[in-house]
Structure formats: structure tokens, C-alpha cells
Regions:
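Conserved phosphate-binding elements of NTP-dependent enzyme cores
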Residues: 1-982
């Protein structure tokens, strides 16, 4: 390949990279891999992307650059052949509470334009299309009748401001008009005036003289009261195709629109069938707003619901608080506020009044129809005829409570049931009601965004349009359907377009970001992705690879930091950074095309292993190292059972979770795994243990050996500390022993230094210039804040005299800069231990740091800022903390995709750590897609079969072998394929 076809990186030194030279082929699909902490992200993001971004910013004007902050040059000699770089990371795209999947992918913007262009406004009264009429519409109407059919062109009588009806009629006579239509009878204007002047009555209450004297407003009022209409006869004609007759009809129609203030009526004789036309956008007495793209924008005041301002929710009475257990019936007391002797009277009265309507008082709330729920909340049909204070419904109950909130007990009650609830006006659609009148194919835009992406794609495929509509919407429909297909291809078909962006996982956000970039069709760029397979079931990985290939085939270079075996094998080129993590990594241990490591030839594999002996990736890809499949599984007899789980898409399932074993919850994205474990099990267990927790999702309860569990821990990937000074040593309590050790040294005793002097969280020994952080942040107003090394302590965090205290030739700063592996070796060295105090402290330090080594984090520094740790590293630090805990009370540990960011080699270590926890009498529940972890489980709970509304069922539960035998289980299918290969 020619030299200019490579992106060439020379001397990369970011973080732990060891001055490496890397060539990345342009226009190819490239995977960067290696163990956790080896330097993959340093190469991909801190070097490649950082330089691409810096060059882009440098090309902008100085005015634009001041808003983008300072971009420092990455630590490398040079980078050649680098195209514009785009990074797609595992971050939630937007924290804006209005941002949705639809707006993030730009599909909603195209939908808005589509509805503005070809949407038909439908009257909610008659169901007829609302449109502005022209004279052409009147001509078309006459052509429905046979030649010679007589008709009259009429204009509603309109009084000009400042005139009476009498003067208006006289003006019509002067203009040459002779007749009007009153009560479906034609009458000469002079005859009508004579009748009126003679005192003839129009109705028992209104005389015709009153009518003649009426001005514009009074005339309209009298017309409404009497139900009468008066029309001016503009012309009389008959259906004809003669050119002159058509010309006359068009002129008369124009005149009728003018005289009738935009309205006109065509009356056919003798049938007296009437057709109304209007140049205004109105029908059935209503004036409608003409569709525009802003009409469908909930981010614009022109389209947003005025009540909730486009959020879709307001603070009000929360249905989930009023009816927390939807499996109860009305009779059994599902309405919590109607319990007790006093408030129970409301329940008794509702049951009594509901009897004539056959209201199902014994049916569980979740089985009630929407109409029945409306009766319970807003009142039975008969309630409308009663006085407000005599009505019985949940709404009326809370109206009564609000009226009495001057009493403390009612104020407390109101606060108990207040929360974020669906907007009562827009019902959560976020748009003003006028937007719902506009339809395409019988559906409003709010109905479309509530469909799953899978169903929405099918709907667009079946959509029937006229030739004109197809022509107008061709490009819009292409953009919408392409983007929907991209979302389906990355396994997000279960989402809806109105799903809030801030409720998505990092993996879902990244894949949505990926589809947005695919939709933009940029070419000649380098896309850098951080583990796009996170959160993806094996079923969806092939589709993700197809999407990445499409991105590459547009003319882009696609670089993925990835650990998934399928993606590594699908790549054109593999770059392996290693061999280990931290200071033991940062080297290029393999770089080559897929054909090299995909070979099944044993001799070729052996040569490859000899050529690249330090590459763990090559060892695993050639199956010379592997994660062993257990030959047996732990037996269990105790369990926790979740009964009737129906949170989100769960279908009222009962699920048993065995105790003292390794349980893995599997299923495609959106099948209900997180709802079951994070949404129900974790908060329900915390509440059972009398701990503070969010309200668990909808379920009947927990049964089984719940009391066997004394603690419950959710080990997530959030940062380990809230303080910017937190680090692994402080989190694992090893730093307490380190401080005691230094305070026990002779110089410390002489100077009066207590353990507090060696803390960077307390005054005394820390540098007060930077408050123990080692750096200072300088605010730059319009530019990005500058983070600079503290000049007082030179980044060492402590005062100079504290650094004079040494143990084994090392001061406190030297110890904080040690890796975990170095620290264990240093503190275990008996040569440094001079007294019993030193021995005891060192034993504690080593015992608390050892679990970090066991979970594969021996490369991180003791004083490493917690904000610099990856999600996977944070999770393993927490795991190490629990492994190191000395109490042995049975604990239920819950992990959500712990293999995120982990290489095969790291997963092997992680499984050893999991087994260590189980051997101590603990129980593990893990949500996972990684097949190497799933095959090692003692028990698998597989949800599905699909995501979204096609998920939420328990497909199969049992050992891996039992799951593999289930033909309905996608997890079982891929597990079988994995074990057959190996």
C-alpha cells in the first residue's frame, strides 16, 4: 500500500505509551485492542482524535477559537495523513430534559417537515379534511352534477363595521344585488325591508325591525340565538362546460368569497343540497392553524403545550403514588388514599355509584380498560350532572384535599401523593392540541413517536401516498427510513422516538450517535469509536458490524477500541497494545491484517505466536489461551423469588434467583433485564433491609429466602469518589494505614506529625495553595478553564517538611505515585520494617491492596485521581473493596455489564474474583451479554424473546446446558455456536 494511504503516528507517548510508531491503513475498518489499561484509549483518543480535533480548531478563526478552549498538541513526534477526526464515545448524548431519541437522530426534524408539507388537517368534530378553498374547488364541485343542473352561488351576509343590517342591504341594492336567502326561502331585498318595517316578528322574542337595526356584533348574536342564516344571492346558473359559463362561474365565486368575507355556499336546486367553501383555514365553525414545521416543535413556543411548556410532565398527583400496586383491584384498595375509616367512605360511595355501569371492582387495576380508569380518576358519566362537592372520583378527592390544605393533615397527605405526572392537557405528547389535528395516513405525529422503531419502519413501508405527495416528500421519506433502518441495524428497534436521551445507557447513546453520523453521510473522515458493542446481545453484533462497514464504505476510516471477538475478526486490520496494563503496557505487541490471525492452519498459528509472543489477543484469537468452560455448576436450594414483575415491558413474570451461586441475567437489548434487576430487585431488597431506596418497579412482592441476605450492593461503573481528591488507596482504606505508618516514623514523632498531617483532605500537612489536589484551576471566562500544576508544591500535594519523612527511602508522594503492584512489593519487603508498628501497618496495607491485584488493577497508581479511571476500572475497584472486606455476612452483589472495557485476559481475572466472593458465602447476580461470562454461570435467566413490546417474558431459566436446549432462546443459540467453535 502506498505511503500516503496510511495514517502514520510517530513516537506516541501519551500516558503510558512507550514512544511507539503505528501505521493505520486509511479507508479501512481497524480494531485497537489490548488488556484494560494497556494504552488503547491513549492511542485512539488522546493521540489520534486529539490531534485531529486540534488541527480542526487551529483552522478556525481566532474569534471562534476563544469559545472552543485551548487544544494542546498530543504527546508524539508527528502524525501524517490524518483526515478530520470524529469521536463517538460511551457518553449520554444530552442532559437536556427535552432531548429525545427522535431529536438526537434528527428523525424528528424530518418528521416535522413531512407533516408540514403533506400533513392533512382533520376536523375533530366532523372528521373531514380542513383546507383553504379556491374557485377551482367550486368548479370541481359543480362537475359532480349532470349538465343543466341548476345551482345558486351564495355569500353569508356580512355587515361592514359601523353599519346596520338595514344600511348593508341598501348598499347591496345599490351594487346591483336583488335577492337574499332567509330560512331557506329566496326573497327580494326590497320585500324583506318592507316586511321588517311593517313590524313582522322573526321569532316570538325578536322582531325583524330589531334585526334591521342590529350592528355587526348584535346581528351575529341574534343569528346565533334564533339559529337563522341569511345569505346574499350572488348568481344563479346551471352546470355547463361552455367556456363563457365557466368564466362566469369563476367570477361569481370570486365575488361570493369577497362579499362573504372569505366564505361561500353552493346550493343545488331543486334538491337544496348545500356545499360550504372558505378561503380561510376553517371547518365546522372552528378556525384551524395551518401546518408549519414549528407547529410540531416542542422546543418552540409555537408548538409546545402551553401547560407543560414542552416537557410532557407537570408537578401534580402522581398515579404511581396513588396506586402503587396495580395488581390490586378497586375493591381490594388499590387506591391508597381511600384507605382507612374516614377516607374509606369515598371508596364505598364510588363502588355504590359504579354498580349501574358494571364497573369491574374486583378486576386488578392493570387490567382495567382506559375508559374504566378514566371513570375512576375523572368521574362516572352520571357525575357530570352533580354538584362539584357531590362528585366521587380520585380527581375530586384531591380537589377536596386542596381545599382543606390549611389543615396540617391534609397538607401532609397532598405532599405524599405529589410528584411528576403526565401533563393533563397534552397527555405527555408535549405538543399543543392543534398539532394532533394534522395527520398522515390517519396518524398524528404524536402517535408515530410513541411507536417502537421496528413498528414505525413497517408503518412507513406500508404508507400509501398520492403521486403529488410522493413527489413532495421523496427526500424526506428517504432520510427518515434510512435513519430508522440504521437504528434497527444497531439493535435499537425496541426504542421509541419520544424516549428521553438522558434515560439511555452509555451504549445506547453511543449507537444513537453512530446512526446520527451515518445519516450525515460524511466522507473522508476517521471515525473513532469506544466499544460500540457495549449493551449488545450477540444477535445484534453482526448488524453492528454491517453498520460500521457501511460507514467505512462511504470512504471513511473506522477505528474501534474493542474487546468483542466477532468485531476483531470482522476488522480489516488489528492493532494490539500491551502486553499488560499501566507501566507494563504501552507497547505495540501486534499490528497486522485479519487474514493473519483468522487462519485455522496450526503451523501458521504457531509462527504467529512465536512472532508476537507478548500479544494476549493473538493467544486468545488462536485459542491457545481461553476462558475455560466449567464442567459442573454449584447446586442451590435457597432462592429469592420476584413475583408478578410488570415494570416497563415485563409481563407479570415470576423469577427465581438462586442464592450462593453465580446467576447471569441475559436477553437482547430492551428485553427487560435492567427493569427486573435494577428497577425491582435492588430497590425492593434495600427496602426489605430497611435502607433508603427509590420506589421499586411494579411487582407483587419478594418471596423465598429473603432473610438469608443481610446486605445488598449494586456495583456500578460510576466514579468511586465524589471528591476530586479521592483515589483507589483512600477508597480501599489502605491510605489510613499508610498515614499511620508515616506518622509512626521517628521524624514524625519528633516533629509532632499525626496521621492527619499526611491527609490531603485536612489542614496541617497538605499544601494550602492547592488544598492537597496538586493542581490549581484558573477560570478563563470565555475560554476553557486552565488546569495547571501547583507552583507551591510542584504537584506533590504536601508541604516540604512532610516530604522529609520517609519510610524505606520513600516519602508520602513517592508512595502515592507507586502502582498497586509496586506498593505491594514495597510494603511486603521486611527489610523496611523496623518495629512492630511498621509490621502491623504494612500487613494491613498489603491485605487491602491485594484485592486490586486480584481483579487485574495492579497497574493503577495508589494516588491516581478517581476521575481518570474508566467505568470498568471504577467497577473493579469497588469489587476489590468488597473482596477485601473482612466481615462475612451474606451479601447479594448486583453487577451491570462488568465486562465493559475488559479484554479476554481481564475477564478471566474477573471470573476468579467473582468465584472468590461466592466462596465467602455471597450471592452474585450479573446482567451480561458476554458469552464467556454466560457460559461460566451456575444459573441463567434469559428474558425476551425480543426487545421492547416483544420482550418482557421469561424465555428460559436454568443451567447453561438447559438454556442451550431451549430453541426459543437466542442466548442459547449463540452459546451453542460458541462452544461448538471451541
Amino acid at each position: 500500500m502506498a505511503k500516503d494511504k496510511y495514517i502514520e503516528i510517530k513516537g506516541a507517548r501519551a500516558n503510558n505509551l512507550k514512544n511507539i510508531n503505528v501505521k493505520i491503513p486509511q479507508g479501512k475498518f481497524v480494531a485497537i485492542t489490548g488488556v484494560s489499561g494497556s494504552g488503547k484509549s491513549s492511542l485512539a483518543f488522546d493521540t489520534l482524535y486529539a490531534e485531529g480535533q486540534r488541527r480542526y480548531v487551529e483552522s478556525l478563526s481566532s474569534y471562534a477559537r476563544q469559545f472552543l478552549g485551548r487544544m494542546s498538541k498530543p504527546e508524539c513526534d508527528f502524525i501524517k495523513g490524518l483526515p478530520p477526526a470524529i469521536a463517538i464515545e460511551q457518553k449520554v448524548i444530552s442532559r437536556n430534559p427535552r432531548s429525545t431519541v427522535g431529536t438526537s437522530t434528527e428523525i424528528y426534524e424530518y418528521l416535522r417537515l413531512l407533516y408540514a408539507r403533506i400533513g392533512k388537517t382533520i376536523s375533530p368534530i366532523s372528521g373531514q379534511e380542513v383546507k383553504r378553498h379556491t374557485t377551482e374547488d367550486i368548479l370541481a364541485c359543480t362537475r359532480q352534477y349532470s349538465k343543466g343542473t341548476k345551482f345558486v352561488i351564495l355569500a353569508p351576509l356580512h355587515i361592514v363595521e359601523g353599519r346596520s343590517l338595514s344600511k348593508q342591504l341598501e348598499m347591496y341594492i345599490q351594487e346591483g344585488y336583488a335577492r337574499i336567502l332567509v330560512k331557506n326561502e329566496f326573497i327580494r331585498i326590497e320585500d324583506f325591508l318592507d316586511k321588517a318595517n311593517s313590524g313582522e316578528m322573526l321569532s316570538p322574542e325578536v322582531s325583524m325591525r330589531d334585526l334591521l337595526e342590529a350592528s355587526d356584533e348584535k346581528f351575529k348574536k341574534l343569528m346565533t340565538e334564533t339559529g337563522m342564516e341569511i345569505f346574499l344571492v350572488i348568481d344563479r346558473s346551471s352546470v355547463s362546460e361552455e367556456k363563457d359559463d365557466i368564466s362566469r362561474l369563476m367570477d361569481s365565486a370570486e365575488t361570493a368569497f369577497y362579499e362573504g368575507d372569505g366564505a361561500c355556499r353552493l346550493l343545488f336546486l331543486p334538491s337544496k343540497i348545500a356545499y360550504d367553501f372558505s378561503t380561510r383555514f376553517e371547518a365546522d365553525g372552528m378556525t384551524f392553524e395551518e401546518p408549519s414545521d414549528n407547529m410540531f416543535a416542542f422546543n418552540s413556543p409555537l408548538g409546545a403545550c402551553p401547560t407543560c411548556e414542552g416537557y410532557g410532565s407537570v408537578i401534580g398527583i402522581d398515579e404511581k403514588l396513588v396506586i402503587p400496586n396495580t395488581s390490586l383491584s378497586v375493591y381490594d384498595g388499590c387506591v391508597v388514599c381511600w384507605r382507612g375509616e374516614k377516607m374509606g367512605m369515598w371508596l364505598k360511595e364510588f363502588i355504590r355509584r359504579a354498580e349501574p355501569y358494571n364497573f369491574p371492582i374486583f378486576k386488578p387495576y392493570f387490567e382495567l380498560s382506559q375508559k374504566e380508569k378514566d371513570w375512576l380518576w375523572h368521574g362516572l358519566p352520571s357525575e357530570k350532572n352533580r354538584e362539584p362537592h357531590d362528585r366521587v372520583s380520585i380527581d375530586e378527592f384531591f380537589r377536596m384535599v386542596k381545599e382543606n390544605q390549611y389543615k396540617i393533615q391534609y397538607r401532609v397527605m397532598l405532599s405524599r401523593f405529589r410528584g411528576k405526572t403526565i401533563c393533563p392537557d397534552c397527555h405527555g405528547t408535549r405538543l399543543k392540541k392543534e398539532a394532533n389535528y394534522v395527520k398522515i395516513g390517519g396518524k398524528s405525529i404524536t402517535e408515530l413517536v410513541e411507536m417502537s422503531i421496528t413498528n414505525l419502519k413497517i408503518w412507513f413501508t406500508k404508507l400509501e401516498l398520492t403521486e403529488h405527495e410522493k413527489c413532495v416528500s421523496k427526500r424526506l421519506l428517504a432520510e427518515i427510513t434510512n435513519r430508522l433502518q440504521f437504528l434497527l441495524d444497531v439493535g435499537l428497534g425496541y426504542l421509541t422516538l419520544n424516549r428521553l436521551s438522558n434515560s439511555l445507557s452509555g451504549g445506547e447513546s453511543q449507537r444513537i450517535n453512530l446512526t446520527t453520523n451515518l445519516g450525515s453521510s460524511l466522507v473522508g473522515s476517521v471515525y473513532i469509536l469506544d466499544e460500540p458493542s457495549i449493551g449488545l446481545h450477540s444477535r445484534d453484533t453482526a448488524r453492528l458490524i454491517k453498520v460500521l462497514r457501511e460507514l467505512q464504505q462511504l470512504g471513511n476510516t473506522v477505528v474501534v477500541v474493542e474487546h468483542d471477538e466477532e468485531i476483531m475478526r470482522a476488522a480489516d486490520y488489528l492493532i494490539d497494545i500491551g502486553p499488560d496494563a499501566g507501566r507494563l503496557g504501552g507497547q505495540l505487541v501486534y499490528a497486522g491484517p485479519a487474514s493473519e490471525y483468522s487462519t485455522t492452519d496450526k503451523e501458521a498459528q504457531q509462527k504467529l505466536l512465536e512472532k508476537y509472543p507478548d500479544s494476549y489477543t493473538i493467544k486468545y484469537l488462536t485459542h491457545h489461551e481461553k476462558i475455560e468452560t466449567p464442567t459442573s455448576h454449584r447446586a442451590w436450594n435457597r432462592f429469592i423469588e420476584i413475583k408478578g414483575a410488570r415494570m416497563n415491558n415485563l409481563r407479570g413474570i415470576d423469577v427465581k434467583l438462586p442464592l450462593n451461586v453465580f446467576t447471569v441475567v441475559t436477553g437482547v437489548s430492551g428485553s427487560g433485564k435492567s427493569s427486573l434487576i435494577k428497577g425491582i430487585l435492588f430497590p425492593a431488597m434495600r427496602r426489605h433491609l430497611d435502607l433508603v431506596a427509590d420506589a421499586p418497579g411494579e411487582h407483587l412482592g419478594l418471596e423465598g429466602d429473603v432473610n438469608a441476605i443481610k446486605h445488598v450492593e449494586f456495583v456500578d461503573q460510576n466514579p468511586i469518589g465524589k471528591s476530586s481528591r479521592s483515589n483507589p488507596a483512600t477508597y480501599l482504606k489502605a491510605y489510613d494505614a499508610i498515614r499511620s505508618l508515616f506518622a509512626n516514623q521517628p521524624l514524625s514523632k519528633q516533629m509532632g506529625f499525626t496521621p492527619a498531617y499526611f491527609s490531603f483532605n485536612a489542614e496541617g500537612g497538605r499544601c494550602e495553595e492547592c488544598k492537597g489536589a496538586g493542581y490549581v484551576t484558573i477560570e478563563m471566562q470565555f475560554m476553557a478553564d486552565l488546569v495547571l500544576q501547583c507552583e507551591a508544591c510542584k504537584g506533590k500535594r504536601f508541604k516540604h517538611d512532610i516530604h522529609e519523612v520517609q519510610y524505606g527511602g520513600k516519602n508520602i508522594n513517592d508512595v502515592l505515585n507507586m502502582t498497586v503492584n509496586e506498593a505491594i512489593e514495597f510494603f511486603a519487603d521486611e527489610k523496611n520494617q523496623h518495629n512492630n508498628g511498621d509490621f502491623d501497618s504494612c500487613r494491613v496495607i498489603v491485605s487491602r491492596l491485594r484485592p486490586l491485584q486480584e481483579v487485574g488493577l495492579g497497574y493503577i497508581k495508589l494516588g491516581q485521581n478517581s476521575s481518570t479511571l474508566s467505568g470498568g476500572e471504577n467497577q473493579r475497584v469497588k469489587l476489590a473493596f468488597f473482596i477485601g472486606k473482612e466481615d462475612q455476612e451474606p451479601t447479594l452483589f448486583i453487577f451491570d455489564e462488568p465486562t465493559t472495557g475488559l479484554h479476554f485476559h481481564d475477564i478471566k481475572r474477573l471470573l476468579h474474583a467473582f468465584n472468590a466472593l461466592i466462596e465467602r458465602g455471597h450471592s452474585l447476580v450479573v446482567i451480561e451479554h458476554n458469552l464467556d461470562v454466560i457460559k461460566c454461570a451456575d444459573y441463567i435467566i434469559d428474558l425476551g424473546p425480543e426487545g421492547g413490546d416483544k420482550g418482557g417474558n421469561l424465555v428460559v431459566a436454568g443451567t447453561p446446558e438447559e438454556v442451550m436446549q431451549c430453541k426459543k432462546s437466542l442466548t442459547g443459540l449463540f452459546l451453542t455456536q460458541l462452544l461448538d467453535k471451541k
